[in-house]
């Protein structure tokens, strides 16, 4: 079940609540497009939300609701073992990276926690409501692709050590045991 990328949103909306899957409405379609633009698809990432159920009247998540759901998110995190986590939106940012700053200030920056890169991004729904955020969101996803390319690239092969001519000379003929001390 591991995935290199984990995407964490805020809470299920109406469509997500009906279908029981995260990001299936208009914001989900935009998320699919953003993923495709960086060569990823839903089956290559793990998508979830801070809240596991829809807040009444689609209101913002309350702090106590988020706290109640965090053990489930932590369990998902342990199972998935991501290399990068996209933190979508202000509410997810406040729960996952408290105190780092506002989403408008820190989106697109990487924050390393326990060897995992967390990157806050605007929520796709915010970009649907405010089209000026779409370019920022696309650039942030491009940064994730660059990060993954660096992290997942096979390591450069070690250069062959230079062998000194003396080391390649044939050993002495005597069968004498040499001492290490």
Label every PLM stretch briefly:
Residues 1-181:
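A polyanion-binding, active-site-adjacent surface
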